[in-house]
A protein has these predicted regions:
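Short coil-to-beta transition motif at edge beta-strands of beta-rich domains
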Residues: 1-11
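Histidine- and/or cysteine-centered catalytic micro-motif in compact active-site loops
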Residues: 12, 35-37
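Short beta-strand-centered aromatic/proline hotspots
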Residues: 15-25
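Short, solvent-exposed secondary-structure boundary/capping segments
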Residues: 27-35
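Intrinsically disordered, low-complexity, charged/polar segments
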Residues: 38-107, 125
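Glycine-rich, aromatic-bearing surface loops/beta-hairpins
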Residues: 111-125
Length: 125
């Protein structure tokens, strides 16, 4: 992975195309700069997945374009395809997740859809 410029980075529940900025093998982490969104983060309480009866049902936004973040080295994979446009990829990832949730009829999916619609408005999509 040392010579990779672009990587697929998993951060919390989102997946991103990112530029590899720095690797710290001794700390098992890498600094990446977000270029595109492949999977929008899952909404809700990560410690109680698919549950709505939790103290706080989190809204989780995608990392912003060019945002830098540390990710575990184990979460990186090489990315050899053309890097998509950030806004286009964000819209596609969000629409895919909304579509998947609309096909479900649960309290959790409805709560997620509500949070995703808020994200959609805040993103200006």
């Amino acid at each position: 992975m040392k010579n990779e410029t672009y990587v697929r980075a998993f951060y919390k529940t989102g997946v991103y195309v990112a530029e590899l900025i720095e690797m710290q093998e001794e700390n098992q982490r890498a600094l990446v700069k977000v270029l595109a969104v492949l999977r929008h983060p899952t909404q809700g309480d990560l410690h109680n997945p698919k549950m709505t009866n939790v103290p706080f049902f989190h809204q989780r936004k995608a990392l912003a374009q060019f945002e830098k973040t540390w990710v575990p080295l184990s979460s990186l994979k090489s990315y050899d395809e053309q890097v998509p446009d950030y806004k286009t990829s964000l819209k596609k990832a969000l629409e895919k997740q909304i579509s998947e949730l609309e096909s479900q009829d649960t309290d959790w999916s409805r709560a997620c859809l509500e949070k995703l619609k808020e994200c959609q408005n805040e993103y200006g999509l």
